[in-house]
Regions:
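Repeated loop/turn-to-beta-strand initiation elements of outer-membrane beta-barrel proteins
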Residues: 371, 472, 517, 655-661, ...
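Outer-membrane beta-barrel initiation region
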Residues: 563-685, 767-795, 911-913, 937, ...
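C-terminal outer-membrane beta-barrel translocator/porin domains of Gram-negative envelope proteins
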Residues: 691-697, 703-705, 711-715, 722-725, ...
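Blade-terminus and WD-like Trp-Asp/Gly-His loop motifs, strongest in beta-propeller folds
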Residues: 286-294, 341-349, 386-395, 431-439, ...
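Beta/coil-rich, acidic/histidine-enriched accessory regions frequently appended to metallopeptidases
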Residues: 12-27, 191-194, 218-332, 336-341, ...
């Protein structure tokens, strides 16, 4: 995955990336890479370093390029650790296998527990590293990576790391061909409907097969200079449209004949969950109850949440579901891509995996009540995959990762401790119990022709059987080729069901342990599969033998059921069937096959590391980027000739823990030079930062003296601030913020006269001098954000911020803020509600001095948080009565305190098909019906609020400085438009109830609240 990194800044709202653990990073060098790791993963990382050097050799031959300096590789031992990384900004979902970023050209990734999968991810990310190395070098100025479509970038990385033989991608292409939805290059580029990894890989395989693999990298190099469409012509001598037509024809000819001889998806069994004819569904990880009556599964039933459901295994009716992860305080997310849950033997409870507090937890769920009964953290196990509840109900088996290496464990529920069954570098995944509780079947790469850790040559997945008591292991490989995984015992324990792709199709098979014979249970046109090639997709009821499995079709996943009597299957030969069904077209490449050559050669480029002496990872700051210097000049105007400019420098350490920003801004004279230094540290769970800044602002006016000379008056305000802020996240959705700081406001007034002959002199302005103001502050805030954002505003969930900020110095008071927002999504609309209060307590009345500006809260500023639509100051000042008098009384719109309530009905008018009433993704637009009500007052005024109308423009603070509490209200309609992802514009038309002007039109540049 290609990523970019930015500098963190404080947020009013926003979710948290929590650093639950401290990782003691070490580093060592290889020929081409700086390797970063922590001690617990050393063995696996040393092997990964050898993989990286081999991939460098492969990719350097493919790209005909060598690195000029070593690149950083940062390894995490597992996915929960990886999700805490600071090297990548923002949240990382469990579907992110790795990131390559452009600023420091780092590869950041977790180890997967399977050497083969880790090698694939590393090879994929290092393609991105070569892509960046080409795009970012000075000798390639004018090279544009930004304009390349995602399918092109990711498809190239997938093809160069996997090759053309891939049953999972072949399944996707077969499905698209069957439903006549093979995309053109233009559709891939413009539409988000097509998964860029799979379709991009298929296109790149076609290009490499027809024109030679060198053409793939040549196409990339040319695309960065002339654009992708032109690059096809210059590099391949064919237009993108013609290539699309060729690829579509070749894909149909390759996949359709064999697919049409197999069982259509709607005939392989009873569709229980989802509709095989429906598009883009997600129903995965089935786990059928022991009696076969119910099935637990993971599904995305709305735009936002992937959740756990329990359904009737015959009808598909939902009987229970887990509380959504956004509103559940116990965990951050379900683990579902590489794991399935397990039922207790009595069928009353269901165990599943979550991400919580930086690690995986085993949760048990009361199926009847929907209540989470237990939460279990297994000590000394970094990550957990695939639970299996024992027949006696006393143990749960699982695959656990420690130091990036997977092993089998059995957890004793009563003793609350785990026993490790295996202890080696082989992949040990997807355990399941035999009916007698003596044996675990699991997926592994051990055994004859298994993984060789010296040559890093990987054995294909097969079935392992381990005696739980003795630890003795034997392997079963029903077919000599292909992946064989996801074992499930039959109720009598005499057979093992599994999924295999030995003939290029992913089907369910049965292996008879007594006969040592294999039987085909399904013959599906597309395939039995989960999200990834190795995701769990099959479950068999422990007592009844009912089978449930997920099927890929129409670009999505449905769950199909079969009764026990239809799971016997037809006997097949152990050698399987010769087939090219897993090969992406062209099946017989005519170009140079460099990719196939190096994928079949594990030794070339593989070298030993030699003696390694890791050292502590440096916390040195490196210059990340320079905000481009700018210089401008102006002649004339209020300030006369001026020179202005600015530059910024941004620094960070290699692990992303520290960020330092330095900015300098100049506007005119030495007095007008400003700047700031901002430092943040996110190494620990308590994030903190310090800042120092100086910001001058100048305001000028021109006039004439009695004798006709010009007078230039320049007023300056100098704001100098120092502050520190800390944030302690309790979870991804809530945090505590602390702040301390001080501000000095200095004032300067200069005046010069200019004669008609150009002579000037400085003059004094009696009484213009002003003493500086000083403020100190301390703040405490509790912030929560469990919202899901749309394209112009939040759609679901909620946000809140409660803050107290004592201010002391030139004026003493306490600022209080309470801001609470809720969003209720009822497809396709959202009902949004907000309540807000801001008050400066202890500030007293308005005193007529400059400090009033610091305690004033307004309802009439469109860019303040408390704006009531229809009552902007600018709009009121334009009213005829204000224009006639030259003064306009707007006291009703400000006070030392304010309160606001808003409600909106948000209708997604234009946007992506999945979200909007009409598809037009280029200018997403929401139609909004709104109602606002606000009131501003000072400390003595809220006793008798008045809703009288037509008083705006007439009321002002009374002689004592107080403001009467007179609410203002409005209702109307607005349109929020996302303009090219850069700005969000809201145009509103409001009916005002406390203005003589009944209707008001306005425009605001900001996202919806």
């Amino acid at each position: 995955m290609v990523g970019a990194v930015g500098t963190a800044s404080a947020q009013y709202f926003g979710q948290n990336k929590v650093q639950y653990e401290q990782f003691n990073f070490k580093t060592f060098e290889t020929n081409q890479f700086d390797i970063y790791f922590y001690p617990s993963e050393r063995q696996a990382v040393e092997d990964a370093a050898r993989m990286a050097e081999r991939w460098y050799d492969r990719h350097s031959r493919t790209f005909l390029r060598e690195f000029q300096k070593r690149k950083p590789l940062i390894f995490y031992a597992n996915s929960p650790d990886f999700q805490q990384t600071n090297a990548v900004q923002g949240q990382l979902g469990q579907g992110t296998g790795g990131v390559t970023e452009s600023i420091k050209e780092r590869v950041i990734m977790p180890l997967t527990g399977s050497y083969a999968e880790t090698d694939h991810v590393l090879g994929h990310e290092l393609v991105h590293s070569f892509q960046y190395d080409i795009a970012l070098r000075k000798n390639n100025e004018g090279f544009s990576l930004r304009d390349m479509p995602l399918w092109f970038i990711e498809g190239m990385a997938e093809y160069l790391s996997v090759g053309r033989t891939d049953s999972h991608t072949a399944m996707w292409m077969r499905d698209a061909a069957l439903r006549e939805d093979l995309p053109t290059i233009e559709q891939l580029t413009r539409s988000q409907e097509y998964f860029p990894y799979r379709y991009g890989q298929a296109y790149m395989a076609y290009i490499g097969g027809k024109y030679g693999d060198a053409a793939v990298t040549d196409l990339y190099k040319m695309s960065g200079r002339v654009g992708v469409d032109s690059a096809f012509v210059y590099t391949l001598g064919i237009t993108a449209d013609s290539l699309s037509a060729e690829w579509k024809q070749a894909t149909r000819e390759t996949f359709l004949p064999a697919a049409k001889e197999r069982t259509p998806v709607d005939s392989i069994g009873k569709a229980v969950i989802g509709n095989p004819g429906g598009e883009y569904q997600l129903n995965i990880s089935p786990a059928v109850s022991p009696d076969g009556r119910y099935v637990a599964f993971i599904s995305r039933r709305n735009l936002f949440n992937t959740n756990l459901f329990v359904a009737d295994a015959e009808t598909g009716e939902i009987v229970q579901q887990l509380e959504g992860t956004r509103s559940n305080p116990h965990f951050d997310a379900l683990r579902f891509i590489d794991s399935a849950g397990s039922w207790s033997p009595d069928g009353r409870k269901f165990a599943f995996l979550t991400f919580a507090e930086g690690r995986n937890e085993i949760n048990t769920f009361n199926v009847k009540t929907g209540e989470i009964k237990t939460r279990t953290v297994v000590e000394d196990v970094g990550a957990i995959h695939n639970l299996a509840w024992s027949p006696d109900g006393q143990h749960i088996a699982f695959s656990g990762l420690q130091g990036g290496i997977s092993d089998l464990y059995v957890y004793d529920l009563e003793a609350e401790r785990a026993r490790q069954l295996t202890n080696d570098r082989y992949a040990d995944l997807q355990p399941t119990w035999s009916p007698d509780g003596e044996t675990l079947a699991f997926t592994t790469d051990r055994g004859p022709n298994g993984t060789n850790f010296e040559t890093l040559e990987y054995g294909e997945e097969r079935i392992g059987l381990i005696n739980v008591e003795s630890g003795k292991i034997r392997t079963i490989r029903p077919f000599s080729t292909g992946m064989q995984h996801n074992p499930q015992f039959s109720p009598d324990g005499r057979s093992v069901y599994f999924i295999a792709d030995q003939d290029g199709f992913k089907d369910v098979y049965r292996y008879d342990l007594d006969e040592k014979a294999t039987y085909r249970v399904t013959k599906i046109q597309t395939g039995a599969s989960g999200i990834t090639a190795l995701s769990p997709a099959l479950s068999v009821a422990r007592r009844s033998g009912r089978m449930m499995f997920s099927v890929f079709s129409n670009g999505g996943y449905s769950i199909v059921g079969r009764p026990a009597e239809k799971t016997e299957g037809e006997r097949v030969a152990p050698e399987g069937e010769a087939s090219t069904a897993a090969v992406l077209p062209p099946v017989q490449p005519t170009g140079g096959g460099l990719v196939d050559s190096y994928l079949n050669d594990p030794l070339t480029g593989l070298e030993g590391l030699g003696p390694i002496t890791p050292t502590k990872a440096s916390d040195r700051l490196y210059l990340d980027r320079i905000v481009p210097p700018s210089v401008g000049t102006s002649v004339g105007g209020t300030f006369g000739p001026q020179v202005a400019g600015g530059v910024g420098f941004m620094f960070g350490d290699i692990l992303g823990h520290q960020n330092l920003s330095v900015f300098v801004q100049a506007n005119g004279t030495i007095k007008d030079i400003g700047g700031g230094v901002f430092y943040s540290n996110r190494k620990n769970r308590m994030n903190y930062g310090v800042s120092v800044s100086h910001q001058p602002s100048a305001f000028g006016q021109l006039g004439r003296t009695a004798n006709g000379n010009f007078v230039q008056i320049v007023q300056r305000i100098f704001r100098t601030q120092v502050g520190t802020q800390a944030s302690y996240p309790f979870s991804q959705t809530n945090r505590l913020e602390l702040g301390l700081g001080g501000t000095r406001y200095g004032f300067d007034v200069t005046a010069r006269t200019f004669s008609r002959f150009g002579r000037s002199r400085r003059i004094d302005l009696p009484g213009a001098e002003r003493d500086p103001l000083y403020f100190g502050r301390a703040s405490l805030a509790y912030v929560g954000d469990f919202s899901n954002s749309g394209l112009t505003s939040p759609l679901q969930g909620g946000r809140y911020r409660f803050q107290v900020t004592p201010q002391f110095g030139s004026r003493n008071y306490v600022s209080v803020l309470a801001d609470y927002r809720r969003y209720f999504f009822r497809e396709p609309v959202t009902f949004a509600f907000r309540g807000l209060h801001r008050g400066n307590y202890g500030a007293g009345q308005f005193q007529g001095g400059i400090t009033d500006l610091f305690v004033r809260e307004t309802l009439g500023d469109p860019y303040q948080i408390g704006f009531v639509r229809g009552y902007s100051f600018n709009s009121i000042f334009e009213e005829p009565k204000c224009q006639r008098r030259g003064i306009c009384r707007i006291g009703r719109l400000y006070g030392t305190r304010m309160a606001l309530g808003s409600a909106e009905l948000r209708v997604p008018l234009l946007g992506p098909e999945v979200l909007s009433l009409a598809t037009f993704k280029y200018l997403p637009t929401d139609l909004v019906l709104f109602a606002d009500a606000g009131v501003a007052w000072t400390s003595e005024d809220l006793t008798e609020p008045s809703f009288s109308s037509n008083t705006i423009g007439q009321s002002n603070p009374n002689a004592s400085g107080s403001v009467a509490a007179q609410p203002v209200t409005s209702a109307g309609v607005s349109a929020r438009v996302n303009v090219l992802g850069a700005i969000i514009l809201e145009a509103f038309y409001a009916r005002t109830f406390q203005r003589s002007k009944n209707w008001d039109f306005g425009v605001i540049l900001r996202p919806g609240w």
